Design a protein with these regions (language model features):
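Non-transmembrane, aqueous-exposed alpha-helical and coiled segments at domain scale
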Residues: 1-237
Length: 237
């Protein structure tokens, strides 16, 4: 039985050429497109128009930074043990982007790609993209993202469904819920949506690691957690 040919449609290169998604990298892309637009090209196979670019970049910017989150702490702790391997520390932080943090964008996009019937969606015990421990009753990131969506003509049925779910459940529509809906408005494959968060948060983690190198806090976190967590086990003085 003949083997299936190995095939990739993303890019090719020769001695003097590099072509990405049909675009000449040095001649058409370098110096002409921003990182968000390049990501859009990689994901969809085409460059975004001006309005798509504005919205997609807004989505990515939203997920770059959110303080000392579990992903940032994981990256810093890994960097403490292996300061020579920034890539390992970034990878450690990215590994925590799942169904609870950042990666919930994927759950929202998958859910909405299957149906926008709010009554049907309400049958789910848990709806991704709703609720936030800090930002309530309104997530300011969601408000701004939907403003950009309206300004670019991308506020549609997916956004409306999430806002209605938020209202009916009386839970904050968080930024990942908004981004999952907006990814659907842009026609993105739901399987790529978590990747937008991974791409964005990688940038933020590099910032955390540079700060850790200049202004370390990981050792202090470790020592204080160790002291508090085991305090009840130690003999009283």
């Amino acid at each position: 039985m003949a083997r299936k040919p190995i095939r990739s449609d993303l890019a090719w290169s020769t001695v003097d050429r590099i072509v990405v998604r049909g675009k000449d990298l040095p001649g058409e892309l370098i110096g002409n497109v921003n990182l968000g637009d390049m990501a859009f090209l990689e994901i969809t196979g085409r460059l975004p128009d001006e309005k798509e670019s504005r919205l997609f970049n807004a989505m990515a910017v939203t997920l770059v930074e959110h303080g000392l989150t579990p992903s940032a702490i994981a990256a810093r702790m890994t960097f403490l043990g292996a300061p020579e391997a920034m890539q390992a520390a970034v990878a450690a932080g990215l590994s925590g982007l799942g169904s609870v943090f950042v990666g919930s964008t994927e759950g929202v996009a998958k859910m909405l790609s299957e149906t926008t019937d709010v009554e049907k969606l309400l049958e789910n015990k848990r709806i991704p993209g709703l609720g936030h421990p800090l930002h309530k009753p309104v997530d300011p990131r969601t408000r701004r993202l939907f403003e950009v969506a309206r300004e670019t003509g991308h506020y549609g049925k997916y956004c409306k469904a999430m806002e209605e779910l938020s209202s009916r459940k009386k839970l904050t529509l968080n930024a990942t819920g908004a981004i999952g809906a907006l990814a659907c408005e842009l026609g993105l494959d739901w399987r790529a949506v978590r990747g937008i968060g991974v791409m964005a948060r990688a940038v933020g983690l590099v910032g955390h690691l540079l700060e850790e190198a200049r202004q370390p806090i990981a050792l202090e976190i470790w020592e204080r957690v160790e002291e508090e967590a085991s305090a009840h086990l130690k003999p009283k003085k």
